[in-house]
Amino acid sequence: MKKYNLINKFILIVWISITSCNAQRTAIENGTASTVNEKNDFSFKPGEIWNDTEGNVINAHGGGLLFKNNTYYWYGEARGKTASQGVNVYSSKDLYHWKFEALALSPATDTLSDIRMGCVMERPKVIYNKKTKKYVMWFHLELKGKGYSAARAGVAISDRLTGPFTFLKSFRPNGNMSRDMNLFVDEDGTAYHIYSSRENYDMRIAQLTDDYLSVTTKDSMLFSEHREAPALFKYQGNYYLITSGCTGWAPNKASLHIAKTLFGPWKQVGDPMTGPDAEHTFGGQSTYVQPIAGKKNAFLFMADRWNPKNLKDSRYLWLPVQFKNDVPFVNWMNEWNKNSFDTISN
């Protein structure tokens, strides 16, 4: 009798294990798994639903990364179906698994604030100022009820990586319209604001003040080609700038410019995307290029595949940057991992 009981218990344990595995597999396939399998799920799947470590869909659009204390921090737009809900921040040690940290910058309840509920905050980027020991956030701001006519840069500050950030001000840099934007800190610690201006016809760059809170008068037009979504990075002494065309939420062809100095001259060298649907940036739009810590000459291209009917459901396209004769390109991959940085030819 004991022998039969042991056999029955063994069969029951096996049946429970198989059932549990099948249920977990189904949950993962359906995007309903409450946790991520951190032992096995080490790959990027561009355009697929991406959940955080709590099983919630990551909500950080038009964003950028900051690497600090051996951790990556991802700042991006918190979006409802259409509403702008502030700026979220996530953290990760490996770039695959992201923990939600906080709503780093919230819309204000003060009806006189530039960032009161109903405003639009887009493309947030955060940099660290070593002199002031402050984290500084810049973003594209549109005032409540003004459509896209305000065209301002917003600035916020925090003592902590995860915030909360305190909104300081919004303005037009040197009187120029400022829409899609990015930040870049050069090797000497000087920071720059790259932004679309004059109804997006001009791409401009302005050097920031030492505290990173304002622009200086060193502000110049890089080129006038009706571009937006700037993503700037540096490699082997050259500066590279990836931008998109201006077609609303619809994807379009990316463009690559190269320069020896940030203020130019900048040379246009074509579309850096290759592979299926490259002429539409794989259905996405550039937002940031991140150097990969611990890997030589490794860069991550970040883009958003916008869903204008439900902005919260816009997907993320993360792909490795490759180089040929010092000219970067981004090739489509359905799935990849960080080992690709070791095998691609830079």
Segments the model singles out, each with a brief description of its role:
Residues M1-S34:
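Bacterial Sec-dependent N-terminal signal peptides
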Residues C21-N346:
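Carbohydrate-active catalytic/glycan-binding domains of CAZyme proteins
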